[in-house]
């Protein structure tokens, strides 16, 4: 289980004469058990990407803790093989001068160190699992469409056989039709691989399509946590505002 408990994070102002710290994440707590699919929904600047970096162990919280099976997430040995990530900008995870084969091999070597012949078969199988043929093995990221690149990023994330995958605005730059295809792929992978998701987004519609629990995030705090099935019954003013902006029931 991933636990986020009383997490706080602030950054020092870059202003020369005002060296005070600005709080970005403020006392956030929630849990993501095995089998859960949780969306963190917030507008731009709400602090959700800072929260995602702490969940991934890339940054340590100033206060509170993020743990995986009661072990601190910022320790590589704790999160290794346990959590994958897919970001909005695929260049964050796909090296521009590596082929798809090399991108997947690099992760496989870190995990298992299998012979190349074995990794070749595994890589082709991974691509097929995300809806790409083996013809993509020799392509570079700049030869891929946005949807194809995200499929490769997803293949890279599942390559380590994780229990969890965190998605940080992973589909927001894609066309609507491609977004739906990727969401359907994520639903399929969740079922076939028994994956748990933390899905960080500004898009309520995508969140409700994929996730069974919603966390509404505002100004670095949890405004509301609610089952997807109960969203239309929410009486929280900010949640209603987001719904009215994006959805019509």
From Swiss-Prot:
Disruption phenotype: Deletion of the cntABCDF genes decreases nickel and cobalt intracellular levels and decreases virulence. Insertion mutant shows attenuated growth in several infection models. It is found in: Cell membrane. Gene3D superfamilies: P-loop containing nucleotide triphosphate hydrolases. Residues 2-244 form the ABC transporter domain. GO terms for molecular function: ATP binding; ATP hydrolysis activity. It is a peripheral membrane protein. GO terms for cellular component: plasma membrane. One of its GO terms (biological process) is zinc ion transport. InterPro entries: AAA+_ATPase, ABC_transp_ATP-bind, ABC_transporter-like_ATP-bd, ABC_transporter-like_CS, P-loop_NTPase. Keywords: ATP-binding, Cell membrane, Cobalt, Cobalt transport, Ion transport, Membrane, Nickel, Nickel transport, Nucleotide-binding, Translocase, Transport, Zinc, Zinc transport. It is an enzyme of class 7 (translocase). Its EC number is 7.2.2.-. ATP binds at residues 42-49. Induction: Repressed by zinc. Nickel/cobalt import is reduced in the presence of zinc. Belongs to the ABC transporter superfamily. Part of the ABC transporter complex CntABCDF (Opp1) involved in the uptake of metal in complex with the metallophore staphylopine (StP). Involved in the import of divalent metals ions such as nickel, cobalt and zinc. Probably responsible for energy coupling to the transport system. Plays a major role in nickel/cobalt import in zinc-depleted conditions. Contributes to virulence. Required for full urease activity in vitro. The complex is composed of two ATP-binding proteins (CntD and CntF), two transmembrane proteins (CntB and CntC) and a solute-binding protein (CntA). This is Metal-staphylopine import system ATP-binding protein CntF.
């Amino acid at each position: 289980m991933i636990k986020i408990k009383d997490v706080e994070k602030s950054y020092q102002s870059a202003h020369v004469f005002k060296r005070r710290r600005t709080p970005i994440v403020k006392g956030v707590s929630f849990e993501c058990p095995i089998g859960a699919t949780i969306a963190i929904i917030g507008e731009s600047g709400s602090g959700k990407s800072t929260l995602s970096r702490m969940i991934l162990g890339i940054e340590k919280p100033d206060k509170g803790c993020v743990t995986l099976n009661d072990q601190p997430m910022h320790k590589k040995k704790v999160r290794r093989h346990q959590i994958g990530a897919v970001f909005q900008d695929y260049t964050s995870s796909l090296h521009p001068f590596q082929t798809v084969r090399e991108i997947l091999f690099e992760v496989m070597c870190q995990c298992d160190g299998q012979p190349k012949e074995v990794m070749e078969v595994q890589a082709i199988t991974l691509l097929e699992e995300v809806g790409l043929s083996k013809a993509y093995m020799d392509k570079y990221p700049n030869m891929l469409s946005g949807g194809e690149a995200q499929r490769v990023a997803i293949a890279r994330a599942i390559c380590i056989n994780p229990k969890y995958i965190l998605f940080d605005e992973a589909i927001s730059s894609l066309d609507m039709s491609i977004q739906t295809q990727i969401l359907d792929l994520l639903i399929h992978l969740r079922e076939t691989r028994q994956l748990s998701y933390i899905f960080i987004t500004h898009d309520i519609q995508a969140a409700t399509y994929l996730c069974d629990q919603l966390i509404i995030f505002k100004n670095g705090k949890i405004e509301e946590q609610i089952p997807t099935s109960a969203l239309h019954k929410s009486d929280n003013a900010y949640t209603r505002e987001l719904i009215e902006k994006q959805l019509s029931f």
